[in-house]
Amino acid sequence: MSELNYEELGLKVGLEIHQQLNTPHKLFCNCSTNLEEEYKLTLERYLRPALSELGEVDVAALFEWKKGKKYVYRIPITTSCLVEADEEPPHAINEEALKIALAIAMALNSNIVDEIYVMRKIVIDGSNTTGFQRTAIIALGGMLKDEEVSIQSIAVEEDAARKIDEGTDQVTYSLDRLGIPLIEISTGPDIRSPEQAERVALKIGQLLRMTGKVKRGIGTIRQDLNISIKGGTKIEIKGVQKLELIPDIVRYEAIRQFNLLKIKEELYRRGLTKELVLSNFVVKDVTELFKNTNSKIIKNGIEKGGLVYGIRAYKLKGVLGWELIPKKRRFGTEIADYVRALAGLGGLFHSDELPNYGITEEEINKVREALNATTEDALILIVGERERLDKAVEVIKDRILLAFDGIPKETRGALDDGTTKFLRPQPGSARMYPETDIPPRRIDEKLLEDAKKLVPESPESKMKRYIVLGLSEELAKEIIRDPRLDLFEELVNKYSPRVPPVVIASTITNTLKYVKSKGGDISKINEEDIEELIKSIYESRISKDSISEILVEYTTSKNVELKDIIRKYEVLPIEELEKIIDDIINSNLDEIRKRKDKAVNLIMSKVMSKVKGRADGKIVLELIRSRLKNVIE
């Protein structure tokens, strides 16, 4: 995909960072914030939307309710209580969570509010047993200065229940995650490129981790993106868990929106209107035409008692196959997403991609004839139960009509390849109302004083401190930019000075680059692996010189444990090392006498090649020098 000119495109990106806070108990009860697989009970709920304080029903809540799904909740033994089950009022807000959030607000120069009011945000996708999420703004404004990106708001809120499984009619959640304290940091729409979006997310994430008061690991931090271009509308993208995906998500979303606007132009260029398309929209049951089909999807659908509907989309030939993201998504994919989300059907085909999937040209022509369609029309085929098909027809019609508006207001979900899919309509202002069970909390001086003690150190201060620890200026800059900065701090506190900070920093930065250059899959290396290596150096089990070789072997091998590779590289006993050095010296006496003092490098190279990282370079050098002295003299 060729790079777009983001300035001409009018790209605007805002971020919402959601980070779990590492407190002993949840935001509104005393349950543990650990995750727990064991459970003994379940409860079942059907949720429906309530009126907001404006007396209106939120469009996103209405959308979820129309799915008619049943929600099943697993009740863990030690990580949930009657509060999570919505059978007991919430307790007072977690004071430690407030202190951590206020400290982060101070670091971002935000304006802290005088009084905290907990609100209910209507959410009825089943992720909250109550049908709402409790949230409270604690600060407004602020700035990420080096990126010139404004902070709009900072809030504390309760995390959602953890999704275990989802079917067509039922979703299963665990209540262990529900109520874990989150901080939500929302930036202004000031980000202007995919790369800047990643940098901003990285810097905010580092700031959060440097408090030492946030959880780490998969699922503990999530990024949402708000993306728009000139002539379009803001699109929300939910659930980005991998930082490195952010640039691709921004690029793909920008080009998707650009092409949706191009489709809008094309529709009007063809002289089409919503009324014209609607009045010529034809639907027929064409099941009989596919009774002998070779298409497995259609055949399986019919065998299960399903029907096949054919739809004529007036003068839309080429539009359904229009690439929104080259080689990844077409306009037809967008329609299929809507049908999947709203009607629960997956079997959708359109004429811009046919013949294919076992559907023949002859079958297409029969459908075209049955629908009285011309070659300028697009054909759509859907398979399923009659009730779902009828719902799907309305969904397809509505999504085609939305194309005349360009970019519909949507909430989309992030996918692993950097693309996104439709989740639901965007929520509006009709989704908030006050929490009546929790009184306001005044921000007093003691709370502010306690928060000040948690404010993380500035990057400039870190730089000076790291140089004092022995890091070069370049290495100090690199570790400050690294997502594992907080791991570096933790390992230095645990294992320094026996393991020099420069060794820890180099392992996290330069060594991983080296491993990648050798074809290693560095995604296999987690924070626990890095600590295991540093701990092994601390315990004198391995030499710092063996780290690269250990990690290369670990990341290029299958079905091996890191601890087994570490065992292979354990430091040689001094007697064995001395024997290796003596043998190599005795085998190279003529060359040593010829080179004299310069022979040190020759022997050093041969010894290190022989021991393969199982000896400390400094010790090897000392032993070689003492022995060569006798030989040369």
Swiss-Prot record:
Per its UniProt record, what PROSITE patterns does this chain match? Answer: GATB
Question: What InterPro entries does UniProt report for this protein, alphabetically?
Answer: Asn/Gln-tRNA_amidoTrfase_suB/E (IPR017959), Asn/Gln-tRNA_Trfase_suB/E_cat (IPR006075), Asn/Gln_amidotransferase (IPR018027), Asn/Gln_tRNA_amidoTrase-B-like (IPR003789), GAD-like_sf (IPR004115), GAD_dom (IPR029351), GatB_C_1 (IPR042114), GatB_Yqey_C_2 (IPR023168)
- Record's subunit section: Heterodimer of GatD and GatE.
What is this enzyme's class at the first EC digit?
ligase
Q: What is a single cellular component term in the Gene Ontology annotation?
A: cytoplasm
The root-end lineage is: Archaea, Thermoproteota, Thermoprotei, Sulfolobales, Sulfolobaceae
Q: Which HAMAP family match?
A: GatE
Record EC number: 6.3.5.-
Here the disulfide bonds are: none
Q: Which family does it belong to?
A: Belongs to the GatB/GatE family. GatE subfamily.
Q: Which NCBIfam families match?
A: gatE_arch, PRK04028.1
For this protein, the record's SMART domains field holds: GatB_Yqey (SM00845)
Q: Where is this region: Disordered?
A: 415-437
Q: Which UniProt keyword terms apply here?
A: ATP-binding, Ligase, Nucleotide-binding, Protein biosynthesis
Superkingdom of source: Archaea
Q: What is this protein called?
A: Glutamyl-tRNA(Gln) amidotransferase subunit E
Catalytically driven reaction(s): L-glutamyl-tRNA(Gln) + L-glutamine + ATP + H2O = L-glutaminyl-tRNA(Gln) + L-glutamate + ADP + phosphate + H(+)
Is ATP-binding included in the keywords of this UniProt record? yes
Chain's role: Allows the formation of correctly charged Gln-tRNA(Gln) through the transamidation of misacylated Glu-tRNA(Gln) in organisms which lack glutaminyl-tRNA synthetase. The reaction takes place in the presence of glutamine and ATP through an activated gamma-phospho-Glu-tRNA(Gln). The GatDE system is specific for glutamate and does not act on aspartate.
Give the GO biological process terms: glutaminyl-tRNAGln biosynthesis via transamidation; translation
Molecular-function GO terms, alphabetical? aminoacyl-tRNA ligase activity; ATP binding; glutaminyl-tRNA synthase (glutamine-hydrolyzing) activity
